[in-house]
Amino acid sequence: MDIIFYHPTFDTQWWIEALRKAIPQARVRAWKSGDNDSADYALVWHPPVEMLAGRDLKAVFALGAGVDSILSKLQAHPEMLNPSVPLFRLEDTGMGEQMQEYAVSQVLHWFRRFDDYRIQQNSSHWQPLPEYHREDFTIGILGAGVLGSKVAQSLQTWRFPLRCWSRTRKSWPGVQSFAGREELSAFLSQCRVLINLLPNTPETVGIINQQLLEKLPDGAYLLNLARGVHVVEDDLLAALDSGKVKGAMLDVFNREPLPPESPLWQHPRVTITPHVAAITRPAEAVEYISRTIAQLEKGERVCGQVDRARGY
């Protein structure tokens, strides 16, 4: 069994050694331009077209929760990957726990009005503020996949009203489910906090725009943990300036790194983190990949395969 590995920023040597230890029967090598030798599996992140084109692979693993970097290249270069080759993403591998920590900490930050107190502190102003009430602090989750379900579970501990929206209806205990474009407005109407965990597909690009933001209650909050392309940044800035949106926590952006000239940096109601809400944990990723390869070799059914038509 031959495995090729490519990631532009990961510690390649660590990964190769860890994979060799986890899959002793495999010959694992770092892929470099010009390497056309045979391979059974490819582990990749933002792979060059030549790495995958023409290969008779058993499967490709994207080294992250999203596969948009691969699917976007496939649109321009359909020869890059045979349609019959299964494409897998890292469904969790520790990302769910990280998303839970990130989402809960920020929701509580807003719920306890720490954002308002920070603004007061900046002007040396001492003034206790009325508290928010849980029953009026409904949290809506856009995108009801693996990570969305994890975030919902963690927020249930804090007894917030919860709702989710996705392409198809979900049956999550204690979570009101909305499905399809026809139910999006009803979903948004009660969301004091909107958490975006949608996949990146042609249908979701630019979905968080002026029309969507106007359907939120006045003074709502936005937490974007998915992809920057989901948000029309000018529309969000306008909503923040008008007070329609009271605050935004943004981990992802249309351009990354976020350019220094972006007005988001200096906006008093925006908090920025550099795409760190959930990073790939190497040890857990290696365990998932080795387990999945073992299942594939045995002909067993496995989880995490991407539907290329849907984009997730």
Swiss-Prot record:
Q: What does this protein do?
A: Catalyzes the NADPH-dependent reduction of glyoxylate and hydroxypyruvate into glycolate and glycerate, respectively. Inactive towards 2-oxo-D-gluconate, 2-oxoglutarate, oxaloacetate and pyruvate. Only D- and L-glycerate are involved in the oxidative activity with NADP. Activity with NAD is very low.
Comment on pH dependence? Optimum pH is 7.0.
Q: Does the keyword Ribosomal protein apply?
A: no
EC annotation from Swiss-Prot or TrEMBL: 1.1.1.79, 1.1.1.81
- The protein, known as: Glyoxylate/hydroxypyruvate reductase A
Q: Which reaction(s) does the protein catalyse, per the Swiss-Prot or TrEMBL entry?
A: glycolate + NADP(+) = glyoxylate + NADPH + H(+); (R)-glycerate + NAD(+) = 3-hydroxypyruvate + NADH + H(+); (R)-glycerate + NADP(+) = 3-hydroxypyruvate + NADPH + H(+)
One GO MF term on file is:
glyoxylate reductase (NADPH) activity
Keyword terms, alphabetized: Cytoplasm, NAD, NADP, Oxidoreductase
Task: Family membership, please give it.
Answer: Belongs to the D-isomer specific 2-hydroxyacid dehydrogenase family. GhrA subfamily.
InterPro entries attached to this UniProt entry: D-isomer_DH_CS, D-isomer_DH_NAD-bd, GhrA_Enterobacterales, NAD(P)-bd_dom_sf
Q: Which domain of life is it from?
A: Bacteria
Location of the active site: 227, 275
User: Single Gene Ontology BP term?
Assistant: cellular response to stress
Q: Which HAMAP family match?
A: 2_Hacid_dh_C_GhrA (MF_01666)
Location(s), subcellular? Cytoplasm
UniProt keyword annotation of Oxidoreductase present: yes
Task: Tell what triggers its expression.
Answer: Constitutively expressed.
Taken from the UniProt entry, a GO cellular component term is: cytosol
